[in-house]
Design a protein with these regions (language model features):
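N-terminal helix-turn-helix DNA-binding core of bacterial DNA-binding proteins
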Residues: 33, 37-80
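N-terminal leader segment of winged-helix/HTH proteins
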Residues: 1-46, 93
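Hydrophobic alpha-helical core bundles mediating ligand binding, dimerization, or RNAP-core interactions
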Residues: 21-43, 118-136, 141-155, 159
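Charged, amphipathic alpha-helical coiled-coil/dimerization segments
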Residues: 2-7, 87-149
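Short acidic DE-rich linear segments
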Residues: 161-163
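Amphipathic alpha-helical interaction surfaces
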Residues: 34, 65, 87, 91, ...
Length: 163
C-alpha cells in the first residue's frame, strides 16, 4: 500500500524549502478560490445549483447515464443523486427512459433544452478559458500547459497514496 511520507520521517529524502512549500500552498489556495468563485458565478448565470450544474456537465461525456453511474462520478450517495436528478427533471433538462436491455434500469438523457443549456455552458467555459490563455504571453503558453500537466499528475499520484 502506498502512503504519504511525512517531512519528519527518516524516509523523507527530497528537500522542499519552506518558502517553496508556503508559495505552493498559497498558489493552490488562490487557484482553488478562483475556481470556486467562477463555479458560483456559472451556477448563478445558468440558474442551476452547484450539484445540478456538475451533474449536467457529466452528460457532455455520455449520451446516457444511470443514477448509480452519476453517484460514482460525483462521489455522492444515491439518495443525494436522486434529489439532483429530480431537480434536473423538474427543469426539463433531462428525461428518463427505460433501458431496452433491462426494464428495471432507468437511463437518463439530456432533453433538447438540456442540450442547449449544456452547449451554452460549454461555450461560456471555452470563452473564459480562451480569455485566460490570452492573458499569458504566447511564448509562455506551452510551458504553462506543460507545468499544469505535471502538477495534475503529481496531485493524482499523491491522491493515490491517500487511498
Amino acid at each position: 500500500m502506498n502512503q504519504i511520507v511525512s517531512r519528519n520521517s527518516p524516509d523523507y529524502t527530497v528537500e522542499v524549502s519552506d518558502y517553496q512549500l508556503k508559495q505552493f500552498q498559497e498558489l493552490i489556495l488562490k487557484l482553488f478560490q478562483c475556481c470556486q468563485e467562477r463555479m458560483q458565478y456559472q451556477c448563478e448565470r445558468f440558474g442551476l445549483p452547484d450539484a445540478e450544474f456538475r451533474c449536467l456537465m457529466l452528460f457532455g461525456e455520455e449520451r446516457y447515464l444511470t443514477a448509480k453511474g452519476i453517484a460514482l462520478k460525483m462521489n455522492v450517495v444515491k439518495s443525494r443523486v436522486s434529489k439532483i436528478i429530480e431537480g434536473l427533471l423538474r427543469k426539463k433538462l433531462i428525461h428518463r427512459i427505460k433501458d431496452p436491455e433491462d426494464s428495471r434500469i432507468s437511463l437518463l438523457s439530456l432533453t433538447a433544452k438540456g442540450h442547449q443549456k449544456l452547449n451554452n455552458i460549454n461555450a461560456f467555459q471555452n470563452d473564459v478559458h480562451h480569455q485566460v490563455l490570452l492573458q499569458i504571453a504566447p511564448d509562455q503558453r506551452k510551458a504553462v500547459l506543460t507545468n499544469l500537466d505535471i502538477l495534475k499528475a503529481s496531485m493524482e499520484a499523491v491522491k493515490e497514496m491517500m487511498v
